[in-house]
Amino acid sequence: MSEIGSYHDTIFALSSGRLPSGVAVIRISGPKTRFVYETICQAIPEPRHAALLTFRSRNGDAIDRGLTLFFPAPHTFTGEDCAEFHLHGGKAVVEKMLAVLGELPGCRIAEAGEFTRRAFANGKMDLTIAEGLADLIAAETEGQRRLAMQVASGNQRKLYSEWRQRLINARAFIEAELDFADESDVPGSVSMQVWQQLSALKHEIEYHIASGKRAAMLRDGLHVVIVGAPNAGKSSLLNFLAGRDVAIISEEAGTTRDLLEVKLDLGGIPVYVTDTAGLRETDSLVEKIGIERARARMAEADLVLSLEDMSGPVSVTVEKIEAETWLIGTKADLGGSASGLWKYHISTMTGSGLEQLLDALQAFAEAKIGQIEDAVPTRQRHINLLRATIEEIEKAIEGDDLPLELRAENMRLASQFLGRITGDVDVEEILDVIFSQFCIGK
């Protein structure tokens, strides 16, 4: 990413989807935006009004004719002069327009996330809002979209700014007691009240972190692993859940050697379902590796579906794991004398029990996620800094034998950690990581 702070260049990029398309949108931002208009359109449109103009190269050749909008600074997404050119979405048209823009002095193609990074640098958004926009663009389910919108709407920033202000106010009381202890207009010994306020804030942050676990599940998805002996019907179940033939189905035992994963959208919640190698004793080195991977994936699962053929000898065994495990009896169409041993009975041949199992999976996912609050930490970066904030608050509260100056310093550090979440203080080292998650043109 280019050096942040100066932004002498004017950047441009294709912001719409893959070509060819009905319409292609090219965005521009920077100090040369008006010059671009004068060169390519020979006119600057009325601000915020669509104008139908011909776009020309520097030698006067017409590139295309389309709509364009001019947005003068500072009331724009980036805070700079901005423009949009709406062209026909042919590959040759767009490539020619981009080439012409690249030939103009002071103009260059934007890097990934550079429009949003400029918006951050110019005070148009904080880091949590930028991260929310990245999540919104990446959202694939309704639940992920809602969560991303909550963050992008600024709810996190409001909460963290309020907490930071409470820390600053508390620290001001302590420093007032230090500096003006002999003055009559300073309340006597405000320290006790401050520690009580900090204790309440600490509990709020702890609760907030706990709610972040559910948000992380919604953002990253829940993981369901299908296990069982060879030919228990694992691959058939995966194919049903996926709605297509993902796994090879064969009478030959041990067909599945590696992990096969599909992504489901269950009520707006992303759920990753993994088919694994059949669990059994084997001399095959390749199959052994597959079984080891299956056991490793089980250890990371939120839910394990343990399948057993109901038509064969009953030998229900479940490996000891922390994840919740459901016993699923398969091949129900072939009968079975011990059906009460299993939580669900299914048949991929007749479809019996499959919709019931799918409904149960959705109910499990919804219960696991629960009700997401308006402001939750959605990134591990947030949680790490919140934990660091709590640690400094605890030092301040519990430091009875320490000078007030040191406890005030703990409070300063706590407010600084909160400021790092929103980008108000000392975040240069993480900017490249955050904004590289955006596509070019955003």
Swiss-Prot record:
Keywords: Cytoplasm, GTP-binding, Hydrolase, Magnesium, Metal-binding, Nucleotide-binding, Potassium, tRNA processing. The keyword Magnesium applies. It is found in: Cytoplasm. GO terms for molecular function: GTP binding; GTPase activity; metal ion binding. It holds the Pfam family MMR_HSR1. GO terms for cellular component: cytoplasm. (6S)-5-formyl-5,6,7,8-tetrahydrofolate binds at residues 27, 84, 124, 442. Homodimer. Heterotetramer of two MnmE and two MnmG subunits. This is tRNA modification GTPase MnmE. The lineage of its organism: Bacteria, Pseudomonadati, Pseudomonadota, Alphaproteobacteria, Hyphomicrobiales.
